[in-house]
Regions:
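Conserved "right-hand" nucleotidyltransferase catalytic core of DNA-directed polymerases
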Residues: 185, 189-262, 277-280, 306, ...
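Conserved catalytic core of nucleic-acid polymerases
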Residues: 399-406, 475, 522-524, 528-529, ...
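Metal-dependent phosphoesterase core characteristic of DEDDh/y 3'-5' exonuclease domains
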Residues: 130-142, 157, 163-164, 248, ...
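Structural signature of nuclease core domains in nucleic-acid processing machines
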Residues: 227, 237-290, 295-311, 756-771, ...
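A common structural junction motif
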Residues: 648, 770-782
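A short, charged helix-loop
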Residues: 39, 147, 153-165, 331-357, ...
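Acidic beta-strand-to-loop metal/phosphate-binding motif
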Residues: 116-122, 224, 283-291, 566-568
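A polyanion-binding, active-site-adjacent surface
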Residues: 1-190
Length: 815
């Protein structure tokens, strides 16, 4: 009955758009079981469907059927249809006018079936039902959406990529499978968040009752917490707007704090002090989403917490490619609605939002944080090595990084403002010189930060006032590129070299460091950086300092206050050492076992000279060779890499020869590269020696460039991830040895850690730091028995890198 009713909806003589002129079968309606009340909507029939007269009967349909079956849905018991009912010529995407013409047919199908659950396949279906696009965005696919078309108002709606997209991009197969499984769970009622009851604590008696309840919780009680805040504690305008807690995931208690409409706006610090003993209980299992942030906030109010489970860190460890924000995770794992409610949480706006709306948002945060823990914990427990990494590295590492952020780095203000003035003068001279290379009529209004103006200057003919350069790279819109890679091609031109210098000095040195530092100092002359343990897919820490110049001109502004020394400890060539271990490269391993310098050996290999005859510049030139070719970089990319990162310039012939000599010197690296490429093509992921997983689905791409990048990532990710994990593990071990009255970690950058040590304790801590870093319990903790030694170089002085008198160094390399 239902089937014949649906068949009658089709009008095979339809002429509402031009598609009927090209289609073999006009007005193809859906197939499957309408009584299941599960509906899947694609875009339009393809060539095979047009020939057979049956939707989703081609290769895309085969993929869909297989994925549905894998997820526990019988493909014959769902109803599958399309937005557009006739095949567009050439299998192009349907146009808006075409799916508007077919709107009545799809609406009729929906009314006849009354689907409880709808899955949209591809951008056309997403646009048709939800009036939005961006199907590959994690905020649009695999999560519950709000339909804008009223005919779908009573349906659960989810979207994912079209199976035809998976055919073109095999690396998306995993994403597609996960979305189908999530949709299947939703149809079975397994994707349902527990509604969070919100308790707004607006009276002193209510607050006292809350504190009493927290204190009465049993041992091992799971408590989630979250704050909404503006700025950080060392900012003069810092404040916490509300604090929420939950111990069952169903009810969240939120205390309004500093806000114009808060009943406690004048007593918010006092209230937090009263919560201190209740929250600092060591027997509680504290859970947070990006808890390092919340802990820093609460520490500003005198509450010092160490949470046991971080939702964001767990999610990142399980899948580094997906979003880690709570909105996405609560939708993906719990089926929760998007709940931010249009709130603007930026520091300058948050106090203008209604306090009850902020508290309601905060309540959802703590409720869903609590509910997510068992889901992520279960996944971690199914992967023991990841669970160990989470428990032994990520969580304790988060607490150590939290303390580093709170301590901050000491800034010598006299140096900061002297350097700022010197740099401003130097940049002005550079811009004046660059203007001499252009017509007078351009000079006064010329903006070196304007892409169109710089493009005009670079690529206009000399007769018309430009430099007359030929563009070598183009943007997606077809315009000549002015980015660094494009401009590097002409760095022999004096004006281009000055432009590159200007960009480095103005945009990086000045705008990224000196100016923000000058306005961001706290009352103790410290700047506080932020580090993310989830910021890089390889597992590397990411933070504000990652791109800081190596020059002493900038770095020697950082140091230690009077009576203290700045101690810098760097791992020597740690990535090369890790690579030697993973690749089992015998020449490299032997060199490190004998205590040899690999950069010196490489310089000798490149020049044919004895060690005693190698100069400083020759060793410097060996560094990019060792690091660039380690992961299989090709000559052209290496040439730019060496120039950009090391200010070392190779001709193309030198690049090719250096690459050849490199792999002749280290023959086992080639076998390692081939092995990792084979592994990633078989599994679509690789695993580091410590157990960190790097998912690389793009290795299945039909685009060879994309595939090659995934293969390169398969080689370098385990090395970079392990090096970063070892650095974080060293920080954890070192923190146990530091007496805060005598020494403190104040920063980390790449392979190094910075400390402030009291002058009279430097002789004690320097050898201690070196010993801890070189003798980490990696085997005992992670089962990793490194086949090469770790070496740490430790030095101290009043300023960063042991520079005792950096005054008058000048802006090196830019004369």
């Amino acid at each position: 009955m239902y089937r014949s009713k649906l068949d009658k909806l089709a009008d095979h003589d339809c002429t509402q758009c031009e598609l009927h002129e090209y289609a073999m079968n006009v007005c193809l309606m859906g197939r499957g079981e309408p009584q299941s009340r599960i509906m899947i909507i694609g875009e339009a029939p393809g060539e095979n469907e047009d020939e057979t007269g049956k939707v989703f009967s081609g290769r895309a349909g085969q993929i869909l059927n297989r994925k549905l079956a894998d997820a526990g849905l019988d493909p014959e018991r769902v109803y599958v249809t399309n937005v557009v009912k006739c095949r567009p010529p050439g299998n192009r995407a349907p146009e808006r006018s075409e799916w508007s013409a077919c709107a009545g047919y799809l609406d009729a199908e929906v009314r006849a079936i009354q689907p409880s659950h709808v899955l949209l396949l591809g951008n056309t279906a997403l646009q048709r039902v939800c009036r939005t696009s961006g199907i590959t965005s994690p905020t649009k696919r695999g999560v519950q959406l709000s339909p804008r078309d009223p005919v779908f108002s009573s349906s659960f709606v989810m979207a994912t990529i079209h199976p035809a997209y998976v055919l073109r991009n095999p690396g998306q197969d995993t994403v597609f499978s996960e979305d189908i499984r999530r949709f299947a769970r939703a149809t079975r009622g397994e994707l349902q968040a527990v509604a969070v009851k919100k308790r707004y604590v607006a009276t002193i008696s209510g607050f006292k009752a809350l504190v009493k309840q927290l204190r009465a919780l049993p041992d091992k009680a799971v408590v989630s917490y979250d704050v909404e805040n503006r700025y950080r504690p060392w900012n003069t305008d810092w404040s916490i707007q509300c604090l929420g807690v939950s111990w069952d995931g169903e009810t969240a208690y939120v205390v309004p704090l500093y806000h114009p409409d808060s009943p406690f706006k004048k007593r918010w610090r006092e209230l937090l002090r009263h919560m201190k003993s209740a929250l600092e209980r060591k027997d509680l299992i504290l859970v947070a989403q990006n808890g390092k942030h919340d802990n820093v906030q609460l520490a500003g109010a005198g509450i010092f917490l160490e949470h046991k489970f971080d939702i964001m860190l767990a999610a990142h460890l399980l899948d580094e490619n997906r979003p880690k924000n709570l909105g996405y995770l609560s939708q993906a794992y719990l089926g929760a609605d998007q709940y931010k409610g249009g709130l603007d949480l930026k520091p300058e706006r948050i106090l203008k939002e209604p306090i009850k709306a902020l508290c309601a948002y905060n309540a959802e945060d703590v409720g869903y944080t609590w509910q997510l823990r068992p889901k992520l914990k279960e996944e971690l427990e199914a992967a023991p090595r990841l669970l160990r990494l989470f428990a032994k590295l990520q969580m304790p590492g988060s607490h150590v990084i939290q303390q580093v952020e709170m301590k901050g780095m000491y800034v010598h203000q006299d140096r900061l403002f002297d350097r700022l003035s010197e740099l401003q003068g130097f940049i002005q001279k550079r811009t004046d010189l660059m203007r001499s290379y252009m017509p007078k009529s351009w000079r006064q209004e010329f903006n070196f930060n304007s892409v169109p103006q710089v493009s005009r200057w670079l690529y206009t003919s000399e007769k018309k006032g430009g430099l007359g350069l030929e563009p070598v790279l183009f943007t997606k819109t077809g315009n000549a590129s002015t980015n660094e890679d494009a401009v590097l091609e002409y760095m022999d031109h004096p004006a281009v070299l000055m432009l590159l210098q200007y960009r480095t000095l103005q945009q990086k040195w000045m705008n990224t460091y000196l100016v923000p530092w000058s306005v961001g100092l706290d009352r103790n002359s410290r700047i506080h950086t932020t580090y993310k343990l989830y910021g890089a897919v390889t597992g590397r820490l990411s933070g504000d300092l990652q791109q800081i110049p190596r020059d002493a001109f900038i770095r020697s502004i950082i140091g230690a206050p009077e009576g203290w020394s700045f101690v810098n400890a760097d791992y020597s060539q740690v990535e090369l050492r890790i690579a030697a271990h993973i690749a089992n490269e015998r020449v490299m391993k032997r060199a490190y076992t004998l205590g040899q310098d690999l950069h010196m050996l490489q310089a000798m290999n490149m020049t044919g000279k004895a060690e005693k005859d190698i100069g400083k510049e020759e060793r410097k030139k060996a560094k990019p060779v060792n690091f660039g070719f380690l992961y299989g970089m090709y000559p052209k990319k290496f040439q730019n890499y060496a120039a950009k990162n090391y200010q070392v310039h190779f001709s193309m012939a030198e690049c090719e020869l250096a690459r050849q000599k490199y792999f002749e010197m280290f023959p086992d690296l080639t076998a390692w590269h081939n092995r990792m490429k084979r592994v990633v093509n078989e599994r679509q992921y690789v695993v580091s020696p410590l157990g960190r997983v790097r998912h690389l689905p793009d290795v299945l791409s039909r685009d060879r460039t994309v595939q090659m990048e995934a293969e390169r990532q398969a080689i370098n990710s385990p090395v970079q991830g392990t090096a970063s994990d070892i650095m974080l593990f060293a920080m954890i071990q070192l923190q146990k040895e530091l007496d805060p009255r005598e020494a403190a970690m104040v920063m980390t950058l790449h392979d190094g850690i910075g400390f402030e040590v009291r002058d009279d304790r430097v002789d004690y801590y320097e050898p201690l730091i070196k010993d801890v870093m070189e003798n980490l319990p990696l085997k005992k903790t992670f089962g990793l028995d490194l086949s090469v030694p770790l070496i740490a170089d430790v030095e101290h002085g009043q300023y960063w890198h042991g520079i005792d008198d950096a005054a008058g160094l000048g802006i090196t390399g830019y004369s």
